[in-house]
Structures are given as C-alpha cells and as structure tokens.
C-alpha cells in the first residue's frame, strides 16, 4: 500500500503517529510505543532506521537530559502526507464499490458498534 511512497507499513505507523500529534510533530519514544503497540527495543530500532533515512530527528528534551524527543523532518512530513493521501484514496475506492444501501447499512452497523464500545467503557466491572 505504501510502496509508492517508499515506505513499509511500520514506517507509516511511526510517521503517521508523529503527523497526527500536531505541530511540531514531535513525541517521546514512549508516546510512539503507546501509539504503535510495539516494544521499546523495536521502537529504538525503528527510530534508528528512520533517522538514517532522514525522516525523523532525535534530540534531548530541554531541561531533562535523559528524555529524548522524536520529530518529523520536512521529508518525513512530505512522505507521511503522501502516504496518508494514498490511504484515503484507496479507502475511497473501496467505499465507492458499495451501493448506497450497503453504505447506509455499514454506517448503521458501525454506529451500533460505537454505542457498544461506549457502554463497555462506561461499565466499571
């Protein structure tokens, strides 16, 4: 899916998490681990590979020399945006294959699921 942008799926996961964070498109590795559901060792390796490709930059957090921040580079922003656009276009093509009735039925089903999730989250048991 992301090959046209020269990205693997895991690269898209990290870049899109940073892009979603808003300006300055910067998160801690811990935040990225929570966003992408990988181990700290996996994230360290991924960040190194992305840094070698100049898609992200790591720097020490101001005021805390132990903390690291990861920021999208200009090239990282460009690639993330291109990949997100490609994903949205692919999703639109899939949705365009549905009839109006199928789209309505899918929307109704998804609303039902969301209500179930909301009830599940509200249940303290």
Model-derived features: positions:
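C-terminal regulatory/oligomerization modules of transcriptional regulators
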Residues: 101-125
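N-terminal helix-turn-helix DNA-binding core of bacterial DNA-binding proteins
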Residues: 1-39, 125
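Charged, amphipathic alpha-helical coiled-coil/dimerization segments
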Residues: 26, 48-108
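Short amphipathic alpha-helical interaction/hinge segments
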Residues: 22, 26, 84, 118-121
């Amino acid at each position: 899916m992301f090959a046209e942008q020269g990205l693997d799926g895991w690269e898209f996961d990290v870049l899109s998490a940073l892009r979603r964070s808003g300006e300055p498109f910067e998160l801690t590795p811990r935040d990225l681990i929570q966003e992408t559901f990988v181990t700290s060792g996996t994230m360290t390796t991924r960040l190194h590979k992305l840094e070698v490709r100049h898609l992200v930059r790591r720097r020490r957090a101001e005021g805390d020399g132990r903390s690291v921040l990861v920021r999208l580079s200009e090239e990282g922003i460009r690639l993330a945006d291109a990949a997100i656009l490609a994903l949205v276009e692919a999703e639109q093509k899939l949705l365009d294959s549905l009839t109006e009735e199928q789209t309505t039925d899918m929307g109704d089903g998804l609303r039902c699921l969301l209500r179930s999730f909301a009830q599940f989250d509200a249940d303290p048991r």
